[in-house]
């Protein structure tokens, strides 16, 4: 995984064109699931894998200031910006790839948006995510997915602008989930523009 790409993108990440048609709609749809869960249980422990500049954390903690939120990312520049824009006492960030992250606690909700394609060993990582999730807890994964020739072409160019990635099809993602004992509660396609690849949201329960 080439971390330097994300270090260089950090200072302009919040202004990238993909914010409008991919990242912002993703946060919107994740919050549709996440906010009701927090409303029921304000003490939820949340892990955000690949938290970037902490945009989701900021939007969620604005509604729930006392939320227990941990964000991790491989890029130190991203994490520095996340810390600068999130001042909640229970919102924490750490520079750490998921492969090396050793949690001393389990989480009620684990979120991974637009990071999963960059994990070299996807089966191992989804297993680790499942292990870090509490029994009865939830996992929300969103990523670009290759399910058609159009997706294949768009994702090829997307991969060329970031770092090495593999955009699994929806059936392949479902197979991974099944192997780790995660139950798919909902699959949702985020549709904004015709020239965007399939953005698949998976809402899972352990």
Predicted feature residues:
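Class I SAM-dependent methyltransferase SAM/SAH-binding core
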Residues: 47, 53-100
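A conserved beta-strand element that flanks and buttresses the S-adenosyl-L-methionine
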Residues: 111
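Core SAM-dependent methyltransferase catalytic element
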Residues: 189-206
């Amino acid at each position: 995984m080439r971390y330097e790409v994300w270090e260089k993108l950090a200072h302009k990440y919040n202004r990238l064109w993909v914010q409008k048609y991919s990242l912002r709609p993703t946060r919107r749809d994740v919050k549709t699931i996440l906010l009701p869960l927090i409303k029921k249980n304000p003490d939820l422990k949340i892990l955000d894998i690949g938290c970037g500049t902490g945009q989701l954390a900021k939007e969620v903690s604005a509604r729930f200031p006392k939320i227990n939120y941990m964000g991790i990312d491989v890029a130190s520049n991203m994490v520095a910006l996340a810390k600068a824009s999130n001042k909640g006492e229970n919102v924490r960030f750490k520079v750490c790839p998921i492969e090396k992250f050793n949690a001393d606690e389990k989480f009620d909700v684990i979120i991974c948006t637009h990071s999963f394609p960059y994990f070299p060993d996807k089966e191992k990582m989804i297993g680790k995510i499942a292990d870090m999730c509490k029994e009865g807890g939830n996992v929300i994964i969103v990523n670009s997915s290759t399910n058609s020739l159009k997706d294949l072409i768009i994702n090829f160019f997307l991969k060329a602008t970031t770092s090495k990635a593999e955009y699994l099809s929806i059936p392949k993602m479902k197979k991974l989930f099944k192997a780790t004992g995660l139950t798919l509660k909902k699959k949702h396609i985020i549709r904004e523009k015709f020239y965007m690849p399939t953005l698949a949201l998976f809402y899972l329960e352990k």
